[in-house]
Amino acid sequence: MVTYSESGVDIDLEELTVSSLTSRLSDTLKYCDVITGAGHFAALVRMGDVAIAMSTDGVGSKILVAEMMNRYDTVGIDCIAMVVNDILCVGARPAALVDYLAVERPDPEVAGEIGKGLAMGAEMARVAIIGGETASLPGIIRNLDLAATGIGFVDVDRIITGEDVSPGDTVIGLESSGIHSNGLSLARRVFFDELELSPEDEMPGSSSSVGDELLRPTRIYVEPIMELIESDVDVHGLAHITGGGFGNLKRLRKDVGYRLDSLPEPQQIFRVIHEAGVDIREMYRVFNMGVGFCAVVAPDDVDEALSILGDRAHPIGEVTDRGSEVELEACTGETIKL
């Protein structure tokens, strides 16, 4: 059985590491009016009647697939998506970003391709890239690493933290474009080690190559989610389904649970990974499994929310009173608890 930990990423150890880091930082929160602390998708700082939302994220080991294919023109889209999708989760409109590119040695051609993707992603998200940092770090970095930090703005009385999520609320899932930018270490282990495929090989059950599927850009949810937020729909919570899978819903409110029994069929890439030996619970713990973003709304507003979000959005379950538990019906028919 292939696991994420065996692929080099230990989720439990990462959580302990983050806790160890942030436990030393809480005393600094006294220096500004912080509304949300560590652990939410984005941090909020009050500036009068408006709050600034901030988030930082990176592309991760998807960069290694780009290196294998010598194709860097889409990873910039992923970088933008990972940041702006998190900012959306507090009800804020993403506004601007700065990027960070660390390289083993400068390569103008590769940098130009990355810049092309960043510009495309910024257009999709309607954000400005206002600066950044490029660092040459031989001995520390092998090839390159790409990340960004973004800000957004939201009126204080329009902030969405998830505290209004209540049992009986409906969870709406917005489809992903594919694997997005999480779980790539496990996916690479499966395709390139277990199945012994190359990036150019056709992915089983698909007309696309393995590399094309792994590099498919992360979907940017700014347009549909901002339209939802600015409507009359009573939005109680928003969650970006990234690392940790549907466990990300537990970041909204600790004393409620979720029952997800109407999930859409995951894309073929996830089926191939599962059939190659990854346990189905591990699949839902690591990957988005076809749903890249969730909106939790009042039951009376479901129809209006769906009309706004379009045909790539589906009711996938409801909020329960089982504190901090996500129970879902997997694509195999099994019931899984996260």
Swiss-Prot record:
Pfam families documented for this protein: AIRS, AIRS_C
GO cellular component terms attached to this protein's record: cytosol
Enzyme class of the recorded protein, top EC level: ligase
SUPFAM superfamilies the record matches: PurM C-terminal domain-like, PurM N-terminal domain-like
Protein name per its UniProtKB record: Phosphoribosylformylglycinamidine cyclo-ligase
Biochemical pathway: Purine metabolism; IMP biosynthesis via de novo pathway; 5-amino-1-(5-phospho-D-ribosyl)imidazole from N(2)-formyl-N(1)-(5-phospho-D-ribosyl)glycinamide: step 2/2
Subcellular localization: Cytoplasm
Domain of life: Archaea
GO molecular function: ATP binding; phosphoribosylamine-glycine ligase activity; phosphoribosylformylglycinamidine cyclo-ligase activity
Family membership: Belongs to the AIR synthase family.
Organism: Methanothermobacter thermautotrophicus (strain ATCC 29096 / DSM 1053 / JCM 10044 / NBRC 100330 / Delta H) (Methanobacterium thermoautotrophicum)
InterPro entries named among the record's database cross-references: PurM-like_C_dom, PurM-like_C_sf, PurM-like_N, PurM-like_N_sf, PurM_cligase
Catalytic reactions on record: 2-formamido-N(1)-(5-O-phospho-beta-D-ribosyl)acetamidine + ATP = 5-amino-1-(5-phospho-beta-D-ribosyl)imidazole + ADP + phosphate + H(+)
Biological process terms in GO annotation: 'de novo' IMP biosynthetic process; adenine biosynthetic process
Gene symbol of the encoding locus: purM
The enzyme's E.C. designation: 6.3.3.1
Lineage: Archaea, Methanobacteriati, Methanobacteriota, Methanomada group, Methanobacteria
Keyword set, alphabetical order: ATP-binding, Cytoplasm, Ligase, Nucleotide-binding, Purine biosynthesis
Coiled-coil blocks: none
